[in-house]
Amino acid sequence: MAGAIENARKEIKRISLEDHAESEYGAIYSVSGPVVIAENMIGCAMYELVKVGHDNLVGEVIRIDGDKATIQVYEETAGLTVGDPVLRTGKPLSVELGPGLMETIYDGIQRPLKAIKEESQSIYIPRGIDTPALDRTIKWQFTPGKFQVGDHISGGDIYGSVFENSLISSHKILLPPRSRGTITWIAPAGEYTLDEKILEVEFDGKKSDFTLYHTWPVRVPRPVTEKLSADYPLLTGQRVLDALFPCVQGGTTCIPGAFGCGKTVISQSLSKYSNSDAIIYVGCFAKGTNVLMADGSIECIENIEVGNKVMGKDGRPREVIKLPRGRETMYSVVQKSQHRAHKSDSSREVPELLKFTCNATHELVVRTPRSVRRLSRTIKGVEYFEVITFEMGQKKAPDGRIVELVKEVSKSYPISEGPERANELVESYRKASNKAYFEWTIEARDLSLLGSHVRKATYQTYAPILYENDHFFDYMQKSKFHLTIEGPKVLAYLLGLWIGDGLSDRATFSVDSRDTSLMERVTEYAEKLNLCAEYKDRKEPQVAKTVNLYSKVVRGNGIRNNLNTENPLWDAIVGLGFLKDGVKNIPSFLSTDNIGTRETFLAGLIDSDGYVTDEHGIKATIKTIHTSVRDGLVSLARSLGLVVSVNAEPAKVDMNGTKHKISYAIYMSGGDVLLNVLSKCAGSKKFRPAPAAAFARECRGFYFELQELKEDDYYGITLSDDSDHQFLLANQVVVHNCGERGNEMAEVLMEFPELYTEMSGTKEPIMKRTTLVANTSNMPVAAREASIYTGITLAEYFRDQGKNVSMIADSSSRWAEALREISGRLGEMPADQGFPAYLGAKLASFYERAGKAVALGSPDRTGSVSIVAAVSPAGGDFSDPVTTATLGITQVFWGLDKKLAQRKHFPSINTSVSYSKYTNVLNKFYDSNYPEFPVLRDRMKEILSNAEELEQVVQLVGKSALSDSDKITLDVATLIKEDFLQQNGYSTYDAFCPIWKTFDMMRAFISYHDEAQKAVANGANWSKLADSTGDVKHAVSSSKFFEPSRGEKEVHGEFEKLLSTMQERFAESTD
């Protein structure tokens, strides 16, 4: 079992009757579906958890009568018989609250459905399965808070935090509300599972241990310090709701509607777009950034489409599911060269080979080595030991955001305590993780928050290209030359020799005449290509020989043909792009070709033009004057997993007057990876034996600098949820995708587009935190009844962390039906339509748990729980008892109309029956942000209301009988209904409408109405005026097409233009 039921079950490990006192047992008296009556239950409490039968089915006491207790059982009761044992646990039905909640789908009693499926290999939940609600195997990175040993701590105090995922970057660890005491031990920063002790507290001489999670009874509201008045809107992104019937963060809302009216669409729209919690990180790149595609090709980021596949760092494809676009301050990321030119030496170039441009909120994938060092220092005459470590922590950004980053943490104490304490700290830090580094992400704009030592140590990575295509082999297959199976290897090696020291107009290159093994290799390989190798001595340098490779077919017997005729090597040089516009070039396809082919080509290049040394580890150096060879070689070496750096040597004239062009030295190292390349060399000074053991091609680090650029357009790609959200740019830098998500509720999250809101002057992505408890179809009704309490308890837990949470109950009618069934089995007196008389009280006890509150404990934090309940009355009848009871409690009513839904008018909100009681509460918010908002809202409601009355008149006497003023009211009302109240949820421009766009649209529609009424009042004829200002009406209607992604400032400018044009056009038309 899990969660709610696991909390009791873990106390009772498959027990036998002998394990407990006889007084703890009762016996089954009767069974009626999920309702079981047990006798001999004196001493049990209401809502106590019990174990029913030999299978330990979990149930809850819901009525006590003498020694008999009525129990609702949360599992199938088939097979229970009278006389079976019933064991009392002494605990209420509770849920587990801690890290891991947001990555699991639960059923109504907090059973993790995915974990149960994996354990049972069944799509059904077997009876008695024992799976904990929160995964006990995952290790969480715990960072202690400000509390230390000796401090007093009370319920709700935050004593640490955990990095759960990129969505919940700081999951606060709270002391359970009913606990308190003095801290006697707290765990240092490190990785812990949920079962490991984190905190030890002593109160009244009794010690208690606490872990990363705690349990809480679902039927008991979590206590708060103070309930506050909610005064901030719950922005849904739906114009009709945000403008006319707003809800607040911490409010209660009812959405009744018949089947097919769009309740679930509105609920999911809330899940996706509302402002309950905005913790999505979006990272994107500048136009022209080259991305490595899954097939090894290179594509500009702006040309990538949804469905394309990019390459991951493991060589496997990653599918693109979204393409975020926008405009933001950009940052240039540039590799720090190991061969930095002096600033005064302007003649010397420093090749910056790893670089890209990203937006401010792009997440850089970085690593920081774990570091611990010990110092001794004297403070006020006292000598201290100081242990300084790098640890994951938090820092507040200037705009108030909490940023998760690596920090330098210092601990010091008098030297009189001896060095043992310092050694102990150093040792515990080293043992805390088996990784040598922290792998984490940080937004580009936040890099300046890092301390100098951490910033200096932090680096990014580039990955080897593990993907292999057969471009080279396919070329050989299609070649007119019938070569042996060794053809690709032979050709790759000779191409390497030619790139290193060959002539750019023929298949000729130079070799060292003293290196007999190299000359033998050339002769052997030439033979395999059906070529002859002709050696000629060179004057300069004397030790070199020129090797001409020519075809046996067309040369000999006194005939001296062109060296390039019928020559497979020359054909490959030209055909594969090794010679471009008369200049040597290493084509990009080579970096994704077969790894053996890449290594052989590089071995040929090293044999021809390389230098190998064993000083301080194996290294190889190649020099070239061609930038195309330099860039291609760097890309090729990195694709194999080698460490590469480049040094530029400026152009010069030597003592003999010889001019030397600018040249580049490419330095390569990489241990076994490089040894494997050198094992394919033939040169006696270059060859090294292959590594004896297998080796892995790892990501390599590079240190980088960041420079802020001006604002510009950015282009992003979002990868599928089941990937690691990382892919490779064409230069093999490992980068993060846009729109990282941490939740597995696929039906809500798969379609999350990247959205932004303006917060503290910077663009922030919007993300709605969803609380979803999904009941399986074959669960007993008792579990369905409990599910609503499970959901609200989870919501309250996140509220206590200082978050704004929305709970969506879809549908509370199903919950009420479960109440009705249990009530019927208990034989209670039915009320209206068979529902129990206490339906209203039960609903109220649930809705009263919503609200904005100051959480218990320190530091001070404010959170809210908003409840949105979808109700499904039979036939759309709003007089249904569940709807009536809900309307009596909730403050906002979004009534859905089946007729509107049938006309495909979505959201199908009936404006004449819907209402919100929060409009006055929100006036303070509107006054400080959009002062005209309440007036515009009232005007819009007035127009719609007047139009409804006029429509009845029109049905009697026709539209022509109306005055021009009334005709304007009707026409503008139609415009509002079609272009303001309706929204296309499947478009980029209308899926989410920010409050600022809603406000500007209201101004535009009301201004159009006022200008028209003013013109008619001045004597204009409306039918003629409507024709002459048709373009203005079209512009007002089209204002919904303004893309919110362009930003508030730009879109507001468009509306200002529209308003000034409107005034001019009406003025012209009435003159």
UniProtKB/Swiss-Prot annotation:
Its EC number is 7.1.2.2, 3.1.-.-. The modification Phosphoserine is found at S858, S928. Residues 494-642 form the DOD-type homing endonuclease domain. It catalyses: ATP + H2O + 4 H(+)(in) = ADP + phosphate + 5 H(+)(out). It comes from the Eukaryota. ATP binds at G257, A258, F259, G260, C261, G262, K263, T264. It is a peripheral membrane protein. The modification Phosphothreonine is found at T131. The keyword Translocase applies. CDD domains: ATP-synt_V_A-type_alpha_C, ATP-synt_V_A-type_alpha_N, Hint, V_A-ATPase_A. It is found in: Vacuole membrane. The modification N-acetylalanine is found at A2. One of its GO terms (cellular component) is vacuolar proton-transporting V-type ATPase complex. Coiled coil: none annotated. PROSITE patterns: ATPASE_ALPHA_BETA, INTEIN_C_TER, INTEIN_ENDONUCLEASE, INTEIN_N_TER. Keywords: Acetylation, ATP-binding, Autocatalytic cleavage, DNA-binding, Endonuclease, Hydrogen ion transport, Hydrolase, Intron homing, Ion transport, Membrane, Nuclease, Nucleotide-binding, Phosphoprotein, Protein splicing, Translocase, Transport, Vacuole. GO terms for molecular function: ATP binding; DNA binding; endonuclease activity; mRNA binding; proton-transporting ATPase activity, rotational mechanism. This protein undergoes a protein self splicing that involves a post-translational excision of the VDE intervening region (intein) followed by peptide ligation. GO terms for biological process: ATP metabolic process; endosomal lumen acidification; Golgi lumen acidification; intein-mediated protein splicing; intron homing; proton transmembrane transport; vacuolar acidification. Catalytic subunit of the V1 complex of vacuolar(H+)-ATPase (V-ATPase), a multisubunit enzyme composed of a peripheral complex (V1) that hydrolyzes ATP and a membrane integral complex (V0) that translocates protons. V-ATPase is responsible for acidifying and maintaining the pH of intracellular compartments. PI-SceI is an endonuclease that can cleave at a site present in a VMA1 allele that lacks the derived endonuclease segment of the open reading frame; cleavage at this site only occurs during meiosis and initiates 'homing', a genetic event that converts a VMA1 allele lacking VDE into one that contains it. V-ATPase is a heteromultimeric enzyme composed of a peripheral catalytic V1 complex (components A to H) attached to an integral membrane V0 proton pore complex (components: a, c, c', c'', d, e, f and VOA1). Interacts with RAV1 and RAV2 components of the RAVE complex, which are essential for the stability and assembly of V-ATPase. Belongs to the ATPase alpha/beta chains family. Present with 199895 molecules/cell in log phase SD medium. This is V-type proton ATPase catalytic subunit A.
